[in-house]
């Protein structure tokens, strides 16, 4: 701590990302990264774009916005891109979520949301998930300025169907609904088709998970034009060039190679099903996930003890020391070999 810290900094509890190990040979199942590499076309596009590094990137990332728009069947002016979906979220809070009434989001969800609230001074209320760790739409019928949902939810992996999101929008025409769809490509239904009918919907997605571009940092939002304009106004008051030319080139190439994307996604979903079965056979309760991870707890072993024991044996999973979920482990769906090693170690421990 320094005497030069502002009052805001003194009260912050920053987000803590998953561990990035320095040593080789670790089975890394703690940060929900894609276990498979990006498309070779992505690597070729990045190499080709390197010669333009002396130039500033397009501040509007027009080529990328047009590619996303074509893929999602929306207009380019309905797309906002940023340096990962975390930056898109970071702009969303001051642009659209800071009002007199509180923002609502689940009590068990992406832990960056309360961090952004504290950083930007956004009043918020946490709405408890039900006993099955599900979001109940009826619980959001309370005074608020906006609703923020991660769908599929993190860290549970449980998803709301599109018609439930549509019902939420219909019940709240005067409140903004933000749907964070970082994991939507692994089996859930996207809310993007609802944007055309609801001016109070903003959908946020990322290239980090299903497109295997976590190291490139590309995210985007889709909404009707006034919402996108609000994000642009905040971005241009902060940094006019958030997405670099390599990221633009790589992300466009990732969209263009649909076959690679579909193959990777299919393999992850199949591995998730096997991992869920194997964990259940070891006595774990596994929540029904539509993400690239599973959320599980053992009936006789604490989550903290299991996470520590796994780490000692070279297997990293994510444990959250938080009420209601302290006995759960969030386990990324890795390759079949990685998941097999996890199960092998768990058999030894249990």
From Swiss-Prot:
Keyword set for this entry? Amino-acid biosynthesis, Aminotransferase, Histidine biosynthesis, Pyridoxal phosphate, Transferase
- Enzyme class label: transferase
Protein's GO biological process: L-histidine biosynthetic process
The record, for Pfam families, names: Aminotran_1_2
Instruction: Tell me which cofactor or cofactors this protein depends on.
Output: pyridoxal 5'-phosphate
Query: Which reaction is recorded as catalysed by this protein?
Result: L-histidinol phosphate + 2-oxoglutarate = 3-(imidazol-4-yl)-2-oxopropyl phosphate + L-glutamate
UniProt keyword Transferase present = yes
Pathway, per record: Amino-acid biosynthesis; L-histidine biosynthesis; L-histidine from 5-phospho-alpha-D-ribose 1-diphosphate: step 7/9
Q: Which domain of life is it from?
A: Bacteria
Q: What are the recorded GO MF terms, alphabetically?
A: histidinol-phosphate transaminase activity; pyridoxal phosphate binding
Which residues are modified to N6-(pyridoxal phosphate)lysine?
A: 209
Q: Any idea of its EC number?
A: 2.6.1.9
Classification via PANTHER family: HISTIDINOL-PHOSPHATE AMINOTRANSFERASE, HISTIDINOL-PHOSPHATE AMINOTRANSFERASE 2
The record's family statement is: Belongs to the class-II pyridoxal-phosphate-dependent aminotransferase family. Histidinol-phosphate aminotransferase subfamily.
Q: What does the subunit comment say?
A: Homodimer.
| Protein name listed in UniProt | Histidinol-phosphate aminotransferase 1
Gene name of this polypeptide = hisC1
